[in-house]
C-alpha cells in the first residue's frame, strides 16, 4: 500500500479507511489479513495505490475459467450499480497535481454475500455442472464476458436487459 504523508489529515483519513476496509471485509469473508506493507511518498498524495490479493490452495481442481464446450451464461452475485464505474480507468491515469482530489470510484462490496457466494460456488463446482467460471474484475461484465469467451475461443451473447440492477435507469455502458 502506498500513501501520501500520514501527517496530512486527508491522507490519514484515506489510510485509516483503507486499513479498516481491508480488515473488516477480509474478516467477514473469513480470509484473514496475514501481511501488508505500507510506504509513504509525496507522489501518492490524495491518490494512493493499494494492491491486495487472496491466496488459497486446494488439493483438487474444482473450477476453470476456460470453457470446454458451449453452454448458458449466468450472472451470479450482487446486483449491478454505478459504483466502481471508471475505477480501472482512473487507476491507469497520470496525475499532474492540477486535478484536485479525484472522486473515489470504489465498488461497494458485500462481504457477507461474497462469503455465501464463495461457499455456494465451491459446492456447485463439485457437481461438475459448471463449464467455466470467471470473476468480474475491475471492468465488470465487460472484462469477464470477454475473457471467458476468448479463453473458450467462442462468442457470447449477453442480454444486458436481464442483468439485475441496483439502480434504475442505468445506461447499457454503465451495466
Label for each model-derived stretch:
Residues 1-175:
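Glycine/proline-enriched, intrinsically flexible loops and inter-domain linkers
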